Amino acid sequence: MRTQLAQRKNQRIRITTEIIKITPVKKAKNTIYKLALRNITSTEFTGKVNHLYVSISAASLPKEDLLILETLAKKQKHPKDEKLSFVGTVYEYKYGTGHNLKLNKNNNVIKFNYSLNQIKKLKLVSA
């Protein structure tokens, strides 16, 4: 997996997935949204990806996407401190600026493109 990432550093990947939890974390002048995602589909991934954790900086988002994220965070059924238990492999990605996030207001589906060289940390965790 790591060698594949190194070879395709600049390739952009499209992922479609469903948001199951949003946790806003307020920093000094910014909010970081931590998203827990499931039902991931992508032509680029090999193997089964069950869940994905994404950290997104509010400062790097367009206002319309930020509004959708805030609305979804308020509407969600999970209490913020509830721990989500996952089965299978968990991939954790942290993003800098420059990714392209597209949110669908109706059914909590998120689509985004990112360049692999924007991933600061990749951690595989067995649940």
For each feature predicted by the language model, list its residue ranges.
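Cysteine-centric segments in proteins
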Residues: 2-9, 13, 20, 71-75, ...
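Beta-strand/loop nucleic-acid-binding surfaces
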Residues: 41-78
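Short acidic, gly/pro-rich beta-turn/loop elements at beta-sheet edges
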Residues: 27, 47, 96-98
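Conserved binding-pocket/active-site segment within a compact domain
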Residues: 46, 78-87, 101, 108
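OB-fold and OB-like beta-barrel modules that bind single-stranded nucleic acids
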Residues: 15-19, 83-91
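OB-fold/S1-family single-stranded nucleic acid-binding modules
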Residues: 38-42, 89-127
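Structural detector for short beta-strands of small beta-barrel domains
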Residues: 5-43
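Polybasic, proline/glycine-rich intrinsically disordered low-complexity segments
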Residues: 45-46, 51, 83, 123-127
